[in-house]
Amino acid sequence: MKRTGKGEKKPAFSRGGRAVALLVAFFVVLAILPQARQWDQEPTGEAAESQPVSAVQTELADTKQEAARFTVCLDPGHGGNDSGCVYGKRHESDDALTMAKLVKKYLEQENVQVVLTRTKDKYVELSERAQCANQANADYFVSIHRNLNPLGCGVETWTRADYSKESNALAEAIQKRMVKVGVQQNRGVKHGTQESASSSYYVLRKTKMPGVLIELGFIDNQKDNQLLDKHKKAYAKAIAKGIIQTYEKYHGEGEKSATNETKSK
């Protein structure tokens, strides 16, 4: 047997030792390999439940909502330096905005998407109001106002002079439900403008969808003001229900309105 001297490396393993080392390494690889192959597989059972949810998955879950049934553009009349009708400290622009926000609330509770032409006491051009509704591709346009006349009282709803059946139905549904809540006088559904039956209010003329303009009583009539203050939530619900009733009648559930108003001459 050869002896090892100074400067000569001693073998680390004998033949038997190398065989044992290789055998141990083989079993180690067998133990690790199944786990290494699972990195790209979906976890199941308890493993799946213990997996952390990624930020992307959380965001997708949070934003996954039921699609809106349809879209309504609510237009609170006047605003900013245009107060509309004024009686004492009471401004038409304030009453209109309060009502629009309430109607919005009740419509959204019924999964209806709502767009407001203004959300605060701000002046908005009539052309911008119409543009807001058209760009939103709204199914309906509802403008909210108040009247002024020392001899007048009651609630009325207007459509365009060249109104469509759907616009008229929308006006009728809203007017009927408000009257049921309680008004001093039912002034009915009217077509055109106060000045001319052959003309139309700008916002109704320039919007491409069925639309109405509501006059919520006379601001200079004490009884009308009392009724509005007492029943404002009920009026808002009546308007919202009238809108939904009309949409369901003409389009059913899940359909997008394809009806556009006929352009005015």
Stretch-by-stretch model annotation:
Residues 49-130:
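Active-site histidine-acidic residue metal-binding/catalytic motifs
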Residues 32-50, 55, 254:
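Sec-dependent signal peptide cleavage junction
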Residues 18-35:
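Hydrophobic membrane-insertion alpha-helices, especially the h-region
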Residues 73-86, 120-178, 194-220:
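Active-site microenvironments of hydrolase-like enzyme catalytic domains
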Residues 92-95, 99, 103, 126-132, ...:
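Stable alpha-helical elements in mature extracytoplasmic
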Residues 101-112, 134-138, 146, 175-183, ...:
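Sec-exported extracytoplasmic/periplasmic mature domains
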Residues 136, 141-144, 192-265:
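Active-site-adjacent mobile loop/cap segments within catalytic or ligand-binding domains
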Residues 1-16, 24:
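N-terminal Lys/Arg-rich, disordered targeting/topogenic segments
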